[in-house]
């Protein structure tokens, strides 16, 4: 597999057991039910962008390498690169936020792979390579019995009259 394999863009091993760090004592009252603060390696700083030394998920160099792999003669404009990097950052942020909400819904203080996996499968129709979904099963339509078919035929026959 090439350098952009299953774990090149999103290293999900970082999400397997991230514990929330208490920011401070939560205030009493209406803010008591606020979302817990989770410290994730490589999250954006004050500027909102990840810096390369903070384990940025998608750097300009990686993006350029990916474009060259698709078409060696293609070159992206600076604005397009910035937009794609911003979209990638927004995607990561939305997935992590939703996964944190799922973990909170499970009444857990630990973000696990299954939280990220559930969100990606249900919202984005994406599967994480290497992680089975033994708990998440798609709904399978039950096969119809002969008795059911006869009842439905009788209903259709009576509604036509």
Curated annotation (Swiss-Prot):
| Residue numbers of Phosphothreonine PTMs | 43, 59
Compositional bias ranges of the Polar residues kind: 26-36
Q: Where in the cell is it found?
A: Nucleus
Where are the Phosphoserine modifications?
51
> Which residue ranges does the record annotate as region Disordered?
15-55
Task: List the InterPro entries hit by this protein, alphabetically.
Answer: Histone-fold, TAF12, TFIID_TAF12_dom
**Key words of the record:** Isopeptide bond, Nucleus, Phosphoprotein, Transcription, Transcription regulation, Ubl conjugation
Which Gene Ontology cellular component terms are annotated? Answer: nucleoplasm; nucleus; SAGA complex; transcription factor TFIID complex; transcription factor TFTC complex
Provide the free-text tissue specificity comment from this protein's UniProt record.
Answer: Ubiquitous.
**For this chain's UniProt record, which GO biological process terms are given?**
DNA-templated transcription initiation; mRNA transcription by RNA polymerase II; positive regulation of DNA-templated transcription; positive regulation of transcription by RNA polymerase II; positive regulation of transcription initiation by RNA polymerase II; regulation of DNA repair; regulation of DNA-templated transcription; regulation of RNA splicing
Cite the Pfam families for this sequence: TFIID_20kDa
Q: Name one GO molecular function term.
A: DNA-binding transcription factor binding
Give all residue intervals belonging to the Histone-fold domain. 59-126
Q: Where is this cross-link: Glycyl lysine isopeptide (Lys-Gly) (interchain with G-Cter in SUMO2)?
A: 19
Asked if Disulfide bond is a keyword of the record, the answer is no
Quaternary structure (record)? Component of the TFIID basal transcription factor complex, composed of TATA-box-binding protein TBP, and a number of TBP-associated factors (TAFs), including TAF1, TAF2, TAF3, TAF4, TAF5, TAF6, TAF7, TAF8, TAF9, TAF10, TAF11, TAF12 and TAF13. Component of the TATA-binding protein-free TAF complex (TFTC), the PCAF histone acetylase complex and the STAGA transcription coactivator-HAT complex. Component of the PCAF complex, at least composed of TADA2L/ADA2, TADA3L/ADA3, TAF5L/PAF65-beta, SUPT3H, TAF6L, TAF9, TAF10, TAF12 and TRRAP.
Entry's family note: Belongs to the TAF12 family.
Q: What does this protein do?
A: The TFIID basal transcription factor complex plays a major role in the initiation of RNA polymerase II (Pol II)-dependent transcription. TFIID recognizes and binds promoters with or without a TATA box via its subunit TBP, a TATA-box-binding protein, and promotes assembly of the pre-initiation complex (PIC). The TFIID complex consists of TBP and TBP-associated factors (TAFs), including TAF1, TAF2, TAF3, TAF4, TAF5, TAF6, TAF7, TAF8, TAF9, TAF10, TAF11, TAF12 and TAF13.
Which named protein is this? Transcription initiation factor TFIID subunit 12
Organism, scientific name: Homo sapiens
Q: Which gene encodes it?
A: TAF12
């Amino acid at each position: 597999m090439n350098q952009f394999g299953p774990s090149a863009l999103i290293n999900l091993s970082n999400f397997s057991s991230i514990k929330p760090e208490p920011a401070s004592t939560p205030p009493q009252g209406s803010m008591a039910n606020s979302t817990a603060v989770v410290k994730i390696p490589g999250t954006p700083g004050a500027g909102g962008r990840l810096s390369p030394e903070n384990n940025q998920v998608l750097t300009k160099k990686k993006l350029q390498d990916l474009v060259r792999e698709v078409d060696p003669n293609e070159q992206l404009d600076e604005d397009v690169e910035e937009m794609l990097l911003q979209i990638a950052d927004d995607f990561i942020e939305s997935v992590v936020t939703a996964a944190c909400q799922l973990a909170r819904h499970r009444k857990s203080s630990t973000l696990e792979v299954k939280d990220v996996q559930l969100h990606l499968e249900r919202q984005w129709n994406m599967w994480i390579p290497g992680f089975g979904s033994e708990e998440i099963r798609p709904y399978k339509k039950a096969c119809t019995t002969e008795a059911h078919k006869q009842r439905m035929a009788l209903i259709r026959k009576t509604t036509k009259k």
